[in-house]
């Protein structure tokens, strides 16, 4: 779950699920850039921090959000988790960015044999399930769905036949 959408109830449910399924990884994923700002040397494009038993959704959201960095300059120390497959943590960060959320999320890796229980919990709690390949391939898919909305001739010296073309994504894109 993205840190911005996390509630204390959701965090408790995920913590309980990780314990019940003996998940090999339950952590708070942040981007390498955010880790650097928090003075945590990143080892990959995304790192995982241990979630303490007393950590709240607000604590994690505040850690993800840089707007209070100047008022709380001495955060930490942070306990790093051994992250699962870096492709998974990087995909979680990318998914947050695609959703235009802060690049941070609480993640659980399923233990072998517990994947079905995790998927059932996800379905019952309206939690997205996707594949890393779908996340990685999204920019190409999105680019292929662009439609031309207008174009205009822009004669330039030495390139008199130049045109500028504007495209729009199928969902309308972000506001400007």
Regions found by a protein language model. Give the residues of each.
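Catalytic domains of riboflavin
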Residues: 1-176
